[in-house]
A protein has these predicted regions:
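Short loop/turn motifs at secondary-structure junctions and domain boundaries
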Residues: 35-39
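Short amphipathic alpha-helix that is part of the acyltransferase structural core
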Residues: 1-31, 52-53, 94, 169-179
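Active-site/acyl-donor-binding loops of N-acyltransferases
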Residues: 1, 49, 55-179
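Short hydrophobic/aromatic beta-strand element in the GNAT-like acyltransferase core
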Residues: 41-46, 56
């Protein structure tokens, strides 16, 4: 189901509650959610299998200020160049953002919806970021994909004491749309 302005308070409550199961999850406010550049509230999808919110995901179009343009290919990639986007081509990419679900099954339904929306809007790629330990990752891996392994680093301007001590076993929240 598409999000709407009247759902924003409930969406924010869900994100704050369920999001706490991930490390580094943002402390969303209604104002912050309404003011994300390029993210329309109706691009948020909400899962309500039993009436209550069980999951949220958004399609965030940042093409107005963030683009990927193929500059060329080198090394072994030159061999595949005829099958890849042309040099100079703009890749229309959107981000799966605000990912928060109570279960992989709920996430699977939301991801299907957001993939369909991305296809309908003619995006070439849907970019998604998940921690390697995230129980939602196997669902995303079920789609044709390219993995780009990365490391998250925690930086601190003080001695980092309290932040470092709060890290635990929970998967990190990685929203690559905000990077």
């Amino acid at each position: 189901m598409a999000g709407s302005l009247d759902q924003v308070p409930e969406i924010v409550r869900f994100l704050r509650t369920e999001g706490s199961r991930r490390q580094l999850f943002p402390a969303w406010t209604e104002e912050a959610l309404r003011n994300l550049d390029g993210l329309n509230i109706d691009d948020i999808r909400v899962a309500r299998p039993n009436g209550e919110i069980a999951g949220v995901i958004a399609l965030w179009d940042q093409t107005a200020y963030k683009q990927s343009i193929v500059r060329g290919y080198s090394g072994w990639m030159r061999l595949a160049a005829p099958f890849l986007p042309r040099a100079g081509q703009h890749l229309r990419s959107a981000y799966a953002s605000l990912i928060c679900a109570t279960s992989p099954e709920v996430f699977a339904g939301l991801l299907r919806e957001i993939c369909a929306l991305a296809s309908e809007r003619r995006f070439d790629y849907l970019l998604i970021g998940l921690d390697a330990r995230d129980p939602l990752l196997p669902v995303a891996r079920g789609y044709r994909h390219y993995e780009y392994p990365s490391r998250l680093y925690l930086a601190s301007w003080s001695n980092g004491g309290s932040t470092n001590e709060q890290l635990d076993h929970r998967p990190a929240y990685v929203d690559i749309a905000t990077l």
